[in-house]
Amino acid sequence: MTVLKTTPLHAAHRALNARMVDFGGWDMPVNYGSQIEEHQAVRTDAGMFDVSHMCVVDFTGPRVRAFFEHAIANNVAKLQTPGKALYSCLLNPQGGVIDDLIVYYFTEEFFRVVVNAGTAEKDIAWFNQLNEQGGFGLTIAPRRDFAIVAAQGPNARAKVWDTVPCARAATSELKPFNAAQVAGTPFGDLTVARTGYTGEDGFEIIVPATHVEALWNALAERGVRPCGLGARDTLRLEAGMNLYGQDMDESVSPLDAGLAWTVDLSAPRAFVGRDALEAHGSRAAFVGLILQKENGRAGGVLRAHQKVATPHGEGEITSGTFSPSMQESIAFARVPKDVAIGDTVHVQIRDKQLPARVVKLPFVRNGKVLAA
């Protein structure tokens, strides 16, 4: 029997009677009662997620910037202000996505990366290989002594400040995709980033694992609702945010996964995977779908791996769900390049081919429905 990994908040989840599931080898909460209410809490007020299964990795050394210029597809030349964050893909030489991650710049000798839970060991092995092969001489340190809490929603930042008043000065002026280090709080030294995976404002807080339960409980006392992986998935799907292993993997180019904006080909950098991307270019479109209704009712729910018939050939849904914010069935799909926004395609659901409308992503941002 496989023993599941647990986060430092495992006992807190159990105490809240969370429904736990195996998520990539981790015992994680899928919900604490009502997934819909958790979703709506984030869209209208404030919710929090335990994302401590994700791995913080610290990179130190004089050549850390040069390392990331080579290692990732986005360009760390964009990182000039301490605390600035960059979303990027980590590619293999064939241009496939090893992982998607966030890189934080703090000094010319210290960068921090947050990688996905299921790919952490693979990522770290790849980083070590690139470091050794390139002679960069970096120290690469996974930080399992940290936990991460994501507080998300229109009122999340204010409730974090109510909980950690000493963090307000360092974080009140933070722009999206920036972080600040806040020392000496009642919850230890924190890294507070204005980032998230929900399409709402908020903070992702890197906190010592020894202090995370106290932070979690303090946030809950101030009305930040615990939320599980179920709401996290519907929120990120509405927000048009990819899930690694579902919307892209090592066999998929970022150019075919709606992630061309994370690939910087403008500078003459020899980053891993560049030659393959330039040789193959984009071979598919990555679009949103909304299942059309007949007589006010949808004939099913869009789900991953359903086939999509178009006049230009077949595609496939990569992620799908019922959207609580839109009251519609929505999906991401990889389809032939000639499929255009506004087209009607047909999705195979059980024994029927049901019509769906092609829309531009995202579906929802900051509580507002964008896809009509």
From Swiss-Prot:
GO molecular function ontology, one term from the record: aminomethyltransferase activity
Key words of the record: Aminotransferase, Transferase
Reaction(s) the record says it catalyses: N(6)-[(R)-S(8)-aminomethyldihydrolipoyl]-L-lysyl-[protein] + (6S)-5,6,7,8-tetrahydrofolate = N(6)-[(R)-dihydrolipoyl]-L-lysyl-[protein] + (6R)-5,10-methylene-5,6,7,8-tetrahydrofolate + NH4(+)
Gene Ontology cellular component annotations, sorted alphabetically: cytosol; glycine cleavage complex
EC numbers for this chain: 2.1.2.10
Pfam families reported for this sequence: GCV_T (PF01571), GCV_T_C (PF08669)
GO biological process, alphabetically ordered: glycine decarboxylation via glycine cleavage system
Taxonomy, superkingdom: Bacteria
Name of the top EC class for this enzyme: transferase
Family: Belongs to the GcvT family.
Complex formation: The glycine cleavage system is composed of four proteins: P, T, L and H.
Chain's role: The glycine cleavage system catalyzes the degradation of glycine.
HAMAP family reported for this sequence: GcvT
Protein name: Aminomethyltransferase
